[in-house]
């Protein structure tokens, strides 16, 4: 059974998402420790959502509520969040609904800005991280691969990518009313990751030329060289803040990058009456108390999300149609898994009889390679129609009818499908 625990901008306050993101590694570890229940897990933590996709070793519908409560308790304990608060701030999707939700998420349909392009890469990286940790089951691997293919299909076949704007560009759009001339703006960029690159590109599109970069992790020099900007030297953050009209933060550090104390020198700077700080980080990069400083305005993800535009309806509808079709096909393929044990048993039964007859013919000297090949081909032909019919029944939810018929007609003993083991990361295999 697949379960998705989802807490996002649609269901939770950004403070709660902030706390969940900070504890993402602990949550992933806690979920993996429930090996008696969880056979696979992938944790997706982005700037506006926290989700855990789980493969649960319990197919009975009655166990869904118990499994969901177990997941909520594990997440709450690992993140230090009350279970009742977590329950009221999240949604739990099961099986087909969980699959369709991931396909919608990876295609940008569930984002703050519908159609934003960053989420597809974040979904892929979440899968990579889970692979490295050895927590991906075969069913989760298949689901996430379908999600990646679906997001590519949505991007290539609809206009949703252009209808929606990225978080970075939306933030700068909101800042437009505060800026009279982008070419004269002095900008401090804090962070050197993917969002920093996207922010720099968006700033340059608006004509910004004076950009300094600061990195809490010490990567400013490398970023500056590759992007043609100025690196803030060690100990130079205060001076850089004093120089800047606009500060954009987009780091993944756990602690605040900017607090009111960082602005002491900047507050004394002449000539800058108002500074705008755009916080694109989650966890938050900027202490909310910064907004109380005179002459400082703070624009954070929570504020940005309130202004997210509605996507062009046609593009969104086309994207949803693609996602719906992909989700239906995934559900159908998943349903086919239920008939596999019966098909395997039937094929084994037929080919065991065939092998026995060929062996008897050989003892009589009546066999030839051509005859054996013809008989094996005939067996395959005879099995084709029952195999097709079995999959059709499975897709219609009637897999048990085929299993019952096979048991009745052929006296087969059909074993239950084994639980898929977790997929071990390649580097772990080679290292052992």
Curated annotation (Swiss-Prot):
Q: Which UniProt keywords apply?
A: NADP, Oxidoreductase, Porphyrin biosynthesis
Q: What is its EC number?
A: 1.2.1.70
Q: Where is this site: Important for activity?
A: 101
InterPro entries per UniProt = 4pyrrol_synth_GluRdtase, 4pyrrol_synth_GluRdtase_dimer, 4pyrrol_synth_GluRdtase_N, GluRdtase_CS, GluRdtase_dimer_dom_sf, GluRdtase_N_sf, NAD(P)-bd_dom_sf, Shikm_DH/Glu-tRNA_Rdtase
Entries under SUPFAM superfamilies matching the protein:
Glutamyl tRNA-reductase catalytic, N-terminal domain (SSF69742), Glutamyl tRNA-reductase dimerization domain (SSF69075), NAD(P)-binding Rossmann-fold domains (SSF51735)
- What is catalysed by this protein? (S)-4-amino-5-oxopentanoate + tRNA(Glu) + NADP(+) = L-glutamyl-tRNA(Glu) + NADPH + H(+)
Q: Which GO BP terms apply? A: protoporphyrinogen IX biosynthetic process from glutamate
Write down the Gene3D superfamilies for this protein, in alphabetical order: Glutamyl-tRNA reductase, N-terminal domain (3.30.460.30), NAD(P)-binding Rossmann-like Domain (3.40.50.720)
Disulfide bond annotation, renumbered to this chain: none
Q: Return one GO MF term.
A: glutamyl-tRNA reductase activity
The UniProt annotation places NADP(+) binding at: 191-196
Which residues are responsible for catalysis?
47 (nucleophile)
- For this UniProt entry, which residues form the secretion signal? none
Sequence positions that bind substrate: 46-49, 111, 116-118, 122
| Known pathway | Porphyrin-containing compound metabolism; protoporphyrin-IX biosynthesis; 5-aminolevulinate from L-glutamyl-tRNA(Glu): step 1/2
- Provide the family line: Belongs to the glutamyl-tRNA reductase family.
What does the annotation say about its assembly with partners? Answer: Homodimer.
NCBIfam families attached to this UniProt entry: hemA, PRK00045.3-4
Miscellaneous note, as given in the UniProt record, is: During catalysis, the active site Cys acts as a nucleophile attacking the alpha-carbonyl group of tRNA-bound glutamate with the formation of a thioester intermediate between enzyme and glutamate, and the concomitant release of tRNA(Glu). The thioester intermediate is finally reduced by direct hydride transfer from NADPH, to form the product GSA.
What does the record's free text say on domains?
A: Possesses an unusual extended V-shaped dimeric structure with each monomer consisting of three distinct domains arranged along a curved 'spinal' alpha-helix. The N-terminal catalytic domain specifically recognizes the glutamate moiety of the substrate. The second domain is the NADPH-binding domain, and the third C-terminal domain is responsible for dimerization.
Q: What is the protein's known function?
A: Catalyzes the NADPH-dependent reduction of glutamyl-tRNA(Glu) to glutamate 1-semialdehyde (GSA).
What is the designated name of this protein? Glutamyl-tRNA reductase
């Amino acid at each position: 059974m697949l379960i998705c625990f989802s807490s996002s901008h649609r269901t939770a306050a950004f403070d709660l998402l902030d706390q969940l993101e900070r504890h993402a590694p602990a949550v992933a570890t806690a979920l993996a420790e429930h090996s008696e229940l969880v056979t696979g897990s992938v944790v997706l933590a982005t700037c506006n959502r926290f989700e855990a996709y789980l493969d649960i070793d319990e197919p009975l519908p009655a166990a869904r509520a118990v499994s969901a409560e177990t997941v909520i308790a594990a997440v709450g304990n690992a993140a230090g969040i009350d279970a009742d608060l977590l329950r009221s701030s999240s949604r739990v999707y099961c099986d087909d609904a969980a699959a369709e939700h991931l396909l919608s998420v990876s295609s940008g349909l569930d984002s703050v800005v519908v159609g934003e392009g960053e989420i597809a890469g974040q979904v892929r990286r979440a899968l990579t991280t889970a692979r490295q940790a050895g927590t991906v089951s075969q069913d989760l691997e298949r689901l996430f691969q379908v999600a990646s293919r679906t997001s590519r299909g949505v991007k290539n076949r609809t206009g949703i990518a252009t209808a929606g704007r990225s978080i970075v560009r939306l933030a700068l759009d909101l800042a437009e009313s505060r800026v009279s001339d982008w070419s004269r703006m002095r900008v401090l960029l804090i962070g050197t990751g993917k969002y920093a690159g996207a922010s720099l590109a968006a700033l340059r599109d608006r004509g910004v030329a004076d950009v300094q970069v600061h990195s809490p992790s010490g990567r400013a020099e490398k970023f500056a060289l590759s992007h043609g900007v100025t690196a803030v030297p060690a100990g130079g953050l205060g001076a850089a803040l004093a120089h800047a009209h606009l500060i954009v933060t987009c780091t993944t550090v756990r602690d605040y990058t900017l607090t009111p104390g960082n602005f002491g020198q900047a507050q004394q700077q002449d000539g800058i009456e108002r500074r705008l700080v755009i916080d694109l980080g989650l966890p938050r990069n900027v202490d909310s108390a910064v907004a109380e400083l005179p002459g400082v305005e703070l624009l954070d993800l929570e504020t940005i999300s309130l202004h997210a535009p509605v996507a062009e309806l046609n593009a969104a509808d086309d994207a949803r149609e693609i996602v719906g079709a992909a989700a239906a096909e995934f559900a159908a393929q998943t349903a086919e898994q239920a008939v596999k044990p019966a098909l395997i048993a039937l094929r084994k039964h037929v080919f065991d009889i065939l092998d026995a007859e060929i062996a008897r013919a050989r003892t009589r000297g009546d066999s030839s390679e051509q005859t054996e090949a013809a008989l094996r081909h005939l067996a395959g032909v005879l099995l084709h129609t029952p195999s097709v019919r079995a999959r059709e029944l499975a897709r219609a939810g009637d897999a048990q009818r085929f299993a019952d018929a096979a048991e009745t007609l052929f006296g087969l003993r059909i074993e239950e499908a084994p639980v898929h083991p977790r997929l071990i990361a390649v580097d772990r295999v080679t290292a052992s």
